Regions:
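Rossmann-fold NAD(P)-binding glycine/threonine-rich loop
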Residues: 2-10, 108-165
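Glycine-rich phosphate/diphosphate-binding loop of Rossmann-like nucleotide-binding domains
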Residues: 8-106, 110, 115, 124-125, ...
Length: 165
């Protein structure tokens, strides 16, 4: 996924040998739950080379309308509220709240953040970039953190390893 040649091929339609594991995992989740993305408005919060940019490029190649934001985008909630599918990978715990999303949105929370939690033996717990408890009643689907995108990313890494033997 990250070799310079493959990274360059990601910008052209169907030329990359591998899509990076996390974006491919996100597509697998959408496919598994029969969530249509062709023609849908996808908002990507986060533009990293690992998740945000490859995910946005692949969504564009698959005929979605894509908007890319980052955590400092002015009035970001006005943009995220337009999303049919909201993909968040910006590394800010509980950034996305219910007033950021429209009713029936599909959310893929790629974020994995540790926050202090004195009730846990290790002193922290893992949360996503979306405040799941806050948005839960408005969403159609949302991936959990932990246990959502992460395990599917690992499965894609294994798939790539086997395919490249």
């Amino acid at each position: 996924g990250f070799h310079t040649i493959n990274s360059g091929k990601l910008t052209s339609y169907n030329n990359a040998k591998f899509i990076p594991c996390t974006p491919e995992g996100c597509f697998e989740i959408l496919k598994y739950y029969n969530i249509e993305y062709v023609g849908k408005h996808v908002v990507m919060v986060g533009g990293s080379k690992v998740v945000g940019l490859p995910m946005a490029l692949q969504m564009l190649h698959k005929e979605s309308t894509i908007t890319i934001c980052h955590k400092l985008t002015e009035n970001i909630q006005n943009i995220t509220r337009l999303a049919d599918i909201l993909i968040v990978a910006c590394g800010v715990p509980h950034l996305v709240k219910k007033d950021w999303v429209k009713e029936g949105v599909v959310i893929i929370d790629v974020g994995i953040n540790s926050i202090p939690d004195a009730s846990k033996k290790r002193g922290y717990r893992l949360v996503g970039d979306v405040d799941t408890d806050d948005v839960y009643e408005k969403v159609k689907y949302i991936t959990p953190v932990p246990g959502g995108v992460g395990p599917v990313t690992i499965a894609m890494l294994i798939k790539h390893s086997v395919e490249n033997l």
